[in-house]
UniProtKB/Swiss-Prot annotation:
Gene Ontology BP annotations: regulation of translation
Superkingdom field: Eukaryota
Cited function: Binds the poly(A) tail of mRNA. Appears to be an important mediator of the multiple roles of the poly(A) tail in mRNA biogenesis, stability and translation.
Principal location: cytoplasm
Single GO cellular component term: nucleus
Name of the protein in question: Polyadenylate-binding protein, cytoplasmic and nuclear
SMART domains assigned to the protein according to its UniProt record, in alphabetical order: RRM
Subcellular locations according to the entry: Cytoplasm; Nucleus
RRM domain span: 14-90, 96-176, 191-275, 299-376
Gene3D superfamilies noted in UniProt: 3.30.70.330
Assigned keywords, A-Z: Cytoplasm, Nucleus, Repeat, RNA-binding, Translation regulation
Coiled-coil residues: none
Family: Belongs to the polyadenylate-binding protein type-1 family.
Length: 502
């Protein structure tokens, strides 16, 4: 059936803007979320390094679904961030924006909407949060018209602020530098310092005397062991930020107790003290920046030198100590049938980093495990081009080396005469790893699909894909949302075949 182009809605009315996205968000995530509203034709995701947020354009088949998505997903949270959803033509410049601070801790984007909707039509609003979803105490409201924002400022000035949830909030016209400045305010000024690398026999009084040469110390946390000896670290809180900076400037990297005195042998360490959540937030941002720059700080790990007899269950029980495992598969080393390898995917890069650091210390039946970040074909080609790369070990079977086979159901590469792998088989193996990683997203459909785990799921999907052209296979490898759509179609086709047989 042909569609009369004159009756088709304009592309702008079919497309919505989705902003404030986490770097963790993939186009497949957006496709899955908005497919609950209606048929999604395309997702165009624009990834940007923090602190600038990523955004996307989602195009629906009809205008009603696009409008419904804006209404129903106005305050939706994805990867611990409240996303911004609006019409494509209502994006910034943000002339109708206001900045609201001193918000109650439990205040949400919906609460902001309820509080300010009396002043005019609101396009979007959000409360800034940490990666764990905790409010930072400030937020932003964007009105459709600038005069509504000015009306808010005028009213709040005459009322000398307004009490919301017990807090007297402050409202200002949005300044692009405010958002950047607020996020850096805490790290810019501090008084608490973390200290280590002092002599084993140093006393609390001795350390305090040293620190107070540079400013008044209001408190000193100096933990000791059961035998009375110091644990080797301390926290000092100075009266003001300048004193803390002065101590760091004059003491860090020096030997204030004398180089010959019994101690760690390392220079004195004093730096800004951070709460656990602050350290986690900085680490998260570091991983996101590195990931955006194409570095191998990922969630997928490749483990080798595993003795035979250790399956997914045994390895999972060992590696779950380091974080939440989303998928795991074990394969047999083609070069040595008595050794195995595994792929493990964690829910966050931070967890994967811990597993790499500590996993290499694990011995199984006398075999020391070799744990590294999974490298795709392009990364390995670059390593080879520039001299082999760090951590490359000849003889260790990478995913595309000859002899690769999966323990479950025997998925193998196709070969040319003489043992060389066919290019098409190469692509299928790469696609297999992507389907394997996506398997947990379809867990609710495993039973109807007739599979019980990730490997069975991936193998069955790949069998369905074998009839596809090489061009289709490459599209699925390159575009997450295309892969997601094709997996869903494979499941649907399988269910349809079952109905026919019945």
């Amino acid at each position: 059936m042909e569609i009369d182009e004159s009756k088709r809605a304009s592309s702008d009315s079919l497309t919505i803007y989705v902003g404030e996205l986490s770097p963790k968000t993939l186009d497949s995530d957006l496709f899955r979320v908005f497919s609950n509203v209606g048929k999604v034709l395309s997702v165009k995701l624009i990834k940007r390094a923090e602190p600038v947020s990523s955004f996307a354009f989602v195009t629906f088949e009809n205008e009603e679904d696009a409008e419904r998505a804006i209404r129903e997903y106005k305050h939706y949270e994805l990867h611990n961030r409240q996303i911004r959803v609006m019409k494509k033509d209502e994006r910034p410049p943000e002339t109708g924006n206001i900045f609201v601070k001193n918000l109650p801790e439990d205040f949400t984007g919906k609460d902001l909407d309820d509080a300010f909707s009396m002043f005019g039509e609101i396009v979007s609003c959000k409360v800034a949060t940490t990666s764990h979803g905790k409010s930072k105490g400030y937020g932003f409201v964007q009105f459709k018209e600038k005069k509504a924002a000015k009306k808010v400022i005028k009213n709040f000035s005459s009322l000398d602020g307004l009490l919301l949830g017990g807090n007297r909030i402050v409202v200002e016209l949005y300044n692009p530098e405010i958002k950047k400045g607020e996020s850096k305010k805490t790290s810019a000024t501090f008084t608490n310092c973390f200290i280590k690398n002092f002599p084993f026999d140093a006393s609390e009084a001795e350390l305090l005397e040293l620190l107070e040469r540079y400013g008044k110390v209001t408190s000193l946390f100096f933990p000791v062991k059961d035998n009375g000896k110091p644990k080797g670290f301390a926290f000092a809180n100075f009266e003001n930020h300048e004193s803390a900076l002065n101590a760091i400037k004059n003491l860090h990297g020096t030997f204030p107790f004398g180089a010959g005195r019994d101690g760690t042998g390392e220079a004195f360490y004093i730096q800004k003290g951070q709460r656990k959540e602050e350290r986690a937030e900085e680490l998260r941002k570091m991983f996101e920046q590195m990931s955006m720059q194409g570095q191998s700080y990922k969630k997928n790990l490749y483990i080798t030198n595993i003795p035979e007899g250790f399956g997914c269950e045994e390895l999972g029980s060992i590696f779950k100590e380091f974080g939440n495992i989303t998928s795991i598969s074990v394969g047999v080393d083609g070069a040595n049938s008595q050794k195995q390898y595994a792929y493990i995917c964690y829910s966050t890069p931070e967890e994967a980093s811990i597993a790499v650091e500590r996993g290499n210390e694990i011995y199984l039946d006398g075999n020391r495990l070799q744990v590294a970040y999974f490298k795709n074909k392009l990364e390995r080609m670059k390593e080879k081009e520039f001299g082999g790369g760090l951590g490359y070990k000849p003889g260790v079977p990478y995913m595309y080396n000859q002899g690769v086979s999966f323990a479950s159901r025997g998925f193998k590469r196709e070969r040319n005469r003489g043992g060389a792998a066919k290019p098409y088989g190469n692509e299928l193996e790469k696609l297999h790893s992507l389907v394997l990683a996506a398997a947990p997203s379809f867990k609710s459909q495993w039973k109807d699909f007739g599979v019980g785990n990730e490997v069975e799921f991936a193998n069955k999907v790949i069998r369905a894909f074998r009839s596809r052209s090489e061009e289709e296979i490459k599209d699925m490898i390159d575009l997450n949302f295309v892969l997601t759509k094709n997996i869903a179609s494979a499941i649907e086709d399988d269910n349809s075949n079952d109905q026919v047989l019945l």
